[in-house]
Each structure stands twice: as structure tokens, then as C-alpha cells.
């Protein structure tokens, strides 16, 4: 297992060194990746069109009429890392009757009375449906770990509980796509400052965001362990280089398309040939 410790100078771009002497997965990402507006527009439209065609097949609205496997897209990432913008462009052309977006914040009093996975069940899609989760059960091993809302025994146990949960979902046919949206500390600060100065967006910036930023080393360590222990064959993590919003949005949708195609083929559904498609560089 590679557990990473933040070193001084992280904000200046120095890599984190892991216990085994290697570099963490987050530091392997090339945050300089970007697209021109023209290339973004072309690839975004292409990927959105392809996703719509696949969704119609999965929903039984085209093709042979069979209802396809559920598709669940899960987002985690830093504050201001672009989750909302990516989600908006992911679903904007899809039939809202068959796609549901759910955002998860801190659990309510009643939700705390149950097992931590309990509250996510109603948001999961059934066959023919699609769900998008803005935050998820990974809060147990991220914010609840760092802020000590969960005991050490609870969050350590959660890795196996999450793996078993996702294994069950996959066994029932679900296509699960997991994203970690990654941005540099400097880019996060720039976005925070822009939000703070914008009267139409300042509400999105909270005192909690600033507090979390100060704890970035602790969160980075938690993220690295999460990736190490829950990146599984049936539920892979896709790390998105997010300093460029254009790059990130295209990569997200192209990745969902690729995973939907793969999942459909594995489950015996014919995947129609795409007229044209460019693939974002994978991590």
C-alpha cells in the first residue's frame, strides 16, 4: 500500500513522497493539459451526441427495445474542482425522465442513525436508468476521516464495506464510473478568489471551504489511500486533470462514453459504431 505524506513546498508543486519511496497518484497527473475552445466544442458535442445515443439504447428507447443496465456516475474531488460544471455538461442533453442528479452533503440526524451506506440507496439507478452523484459514500474515508466525524475503526472498516457494496452493484449489472476531480492548490486559490469577488457566485464559497484548504495535506493522504484501496476491476477510479475546465469536461464525458460502451458489450448489448470520436488521455 502506498500512503503519502505531504512535504513542505507542496503548494509550489513539489511531489509528495510515499512510504515505499514512490510518488502518489495525484502527483502523477499532468495539470498543464488543456484544450483550445474550438477543440473543446468539437469534442464535447461529439461525446454528448454519442452519450445520448447510448442512453437511448440503455433506456430501451432505441435499439432492440431491451432495457439496459443501470449507469451510475460518481464524482469526488476538491472544493471548486469543477464537479458541478462537468455534471451540467454530462446531463444537459439527456432525457431528464431517465437521469437523476443527487448532491450529498453532511448526513442528517436521522441518516446518522443508520449505517453510513443507507442514505445512498434511494439515489441509485435501476435498470434502464442513470444516476449522477455529486459526492458519495466516499465521504466516510475522506471528510469524515479527516474531520474525525467517524472513528478510526469506522473509517478503516469502511474500505471493505465500500468494496463489498460496489461489488454487489456490479454483480447486479450496474456500470459504475468513479471520478476524482483534481486541481492544484494554486488553481483552487484562484477559483476561491474569483468566487469571493463575484456577487452571483460568492454564495458557493464558505468558511468550511477555507478550513478544508488548510487541511489539504491530511486530505491528500486520505485520497491516496482511498485510491489505493478502492480502485478495483469492477469499479475503477478515473483521475481528471482539472486545472483546465475545458480539458476536464471533455475527459469526463468521453470517459463515461467509453465505460458505458465497455459495460454494454460485457453485458451482451450491441454497441453501435460511433461515426467519430476522440478519446481523452486516460489516467
Where are these regions (language model features)?
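NTP-dependent small-molecule kinase module
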Residues: 2, 215, 221-283
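A glycine- and Lys/Arg-enriched "phosphate-lid" helix/loop adjacent to the NTP-binding pocket
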Residues: 3, 34, 143-161, 169-221, ...
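Charged, amphipathic alpha-helical linker segments immediately N-terminal to NTP-binding catalytic cores
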Residues: 7, 16-48
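Conserved nucleotide-sensing/catalytic segment adjacent to the nucleotide-binding pocket
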Residues: 36, 99-104, 109-154
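Phosphate-binding P-loop
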Residues: 58-69
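Phosphate-binding beta-loop-alpha motif at adenosine-nucleotide cofactor sites
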Residues: 73, 174-187, 207-211, 232-251
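Glycine-rich phosphate-binding P-loop
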Residues: 75-90
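Short glycine-/polar-rich loops that comprise or flank the Walker A/P-loop
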Residues: 95-100, 126-129, 169-177, 198-201, ...
Amino acid at each position: 500500500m502506498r500512503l503519502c505524506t505531504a512535504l513542505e513546498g507542496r503548494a509550489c508543486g513539489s511531489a509528495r513522497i510515499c512510504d515505499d519511496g514512490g510518488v502518489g497518484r495525484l502527483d502523477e497527473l499532468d495539470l498543464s493539459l488543456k484544450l483550445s475552445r474550438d477543440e473543446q466544442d468539437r469534442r464535447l458535442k461529439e461525446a454528448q451526441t454519442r452519450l445520448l445515443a447510448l442512453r437511448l439504447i440503455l433506456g430501451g428507447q432505441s435499439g432492440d427495445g431491451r432495457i439496459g443496465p443501470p449507469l451510475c456516475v460518481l464524482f469526488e474531488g476538491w472544493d471548486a474542482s469543477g464537479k458541478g460544471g462537468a455534471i451540467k455538461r454530462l446531463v444537459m442533453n439527456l432525457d431528464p425522465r431517465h437521469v437523476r442528479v443527487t448532491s450529498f452533503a453532511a448526513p442528517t440526524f436521522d441518516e446518522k442513525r443508520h449505517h453510513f451506506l443507507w442514505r445512498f440507496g434511494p439515489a441509485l439507478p435501476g435498470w434502464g436508468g442513470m444516476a449522477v452523484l455529486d459526492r458519495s459514500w466516499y465521504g466516510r474515508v475522506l471528510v469524515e476521516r479527516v474531520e474525525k466525524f467517524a472513528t478510526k475503526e469506522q473509517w478503516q472498516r469502511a474500505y471493505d464495506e465500500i468494496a463489498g457494496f460496489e461489488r454487489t452493484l456490479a454483480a447486479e449489472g450496474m456500470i459504475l464510473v468513479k471520478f476524482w476531480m483534481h486541481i492544484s492548490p494554486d488553481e483552487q486559490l484562484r477559483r476561491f478568489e474569483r468566487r469571493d469577488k463575484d456577487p452571483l457566485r460568492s454564495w458557493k464559497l464558505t468558511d468550511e471551504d477555507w478550513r478544508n484548504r488548510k487541511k489539504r495535506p491530511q486530505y491528500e493522504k486520505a485520497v491516496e489511500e482511498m485510491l489505493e484501496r478502492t480502485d478495483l476491476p469492477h469499479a475503477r477510479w478515473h483521475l481528471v486533470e482539472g486545472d483546465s475546465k475545458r480539458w476536464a469536461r471533455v475527459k469526463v464525458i468521453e470517459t463515461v462514453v467509453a465505460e458505458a460502451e465497455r459495460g454494454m458489450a460485457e453485458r451482451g448489448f450491441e454497441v453501435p459504431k460511433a461515426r467519430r470520436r476522440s478519446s481523452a488521455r486516460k489516467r
